[in-house]
């Protein structure tokens, strides 16, 4: 169904993150007829891939990266470029009619023992939203938030200091 029609009462499961894990669980829940909403902080499904460094490709073969129900096309490269993965994720959401809210930040949640539901606080395109799902699944990935721990002596280093999350291309150094 369309996201616009989804209400807090309708939401059985709230999935945080529209990457490979979040979309996979949403697809499985849909096949089980369990209402599910996926929220993604990026502006588009697949942006978690699109926004990474220019030369990124999957580090293992296409055949071990399939999502449930619809496999990557066999004619695609063995090691998929990031933009192909990103586009596939968007297609996957449309093909399986998954409910996804993009530009949505998960702020916090607390469990209400009395009702047996969560109280989830979201900000969707700048607007606060409150949902009451029965379950919340965190599918935020392993590298969603860069670790910028202090490094002793870093302030004395004369070269360029850059976190890998900020690297997009070698062009400035070529």
Residue ranges and their predicted role:
Residues 79-145:
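Feature captures the FAD/FMN-dependent oxidoreductase FAD-binding
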Residues 10-38:
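N-terminal Rossmann-like FAD-binding beta1-loop-alpha1 element of flavoenzymes
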Residues 10-12, 103, 174:
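Phosphate-coordination loops involved in phosphoryl transfer and adenosine-cofactor binding
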């Amino acid at each position: 169904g369309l996201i616009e029609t989804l209400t807090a009462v309708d939401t059985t499961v709230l999935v945080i993150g529209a990457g490979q894990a979040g979309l996979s669980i949403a697809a499985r829940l849909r096949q089980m007829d369990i209402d599910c909403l996926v929220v993604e902080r990026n502006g588009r499904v697949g942006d978690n891939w699109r926004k990474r460094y220019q030369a990124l490709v999957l580090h293992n073969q296409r055949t071990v990266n399939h999502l449930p129900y619809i496999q990557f096309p066999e004619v695609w490269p063995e090691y998929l470029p990031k933009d192909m993965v990103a586009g596939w994720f968007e297609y996957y959401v449309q093909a399986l009619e998954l409910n996804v809210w993009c530009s949505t930040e998960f702020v916090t949640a607390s469990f209400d023992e009395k009702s047996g539901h969560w109280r989830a606080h979201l900000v969707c395109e700048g607007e606060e939203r409150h949902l009451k799902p029965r379950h919340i699944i965190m599918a935020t990935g392993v590298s969603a938030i860069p670790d910028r721990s202090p490094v002793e002596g870093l302030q004395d280093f004369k070269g360029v200091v850059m976190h890998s999350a900020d690297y997009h291309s070698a062009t400035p150094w070529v």
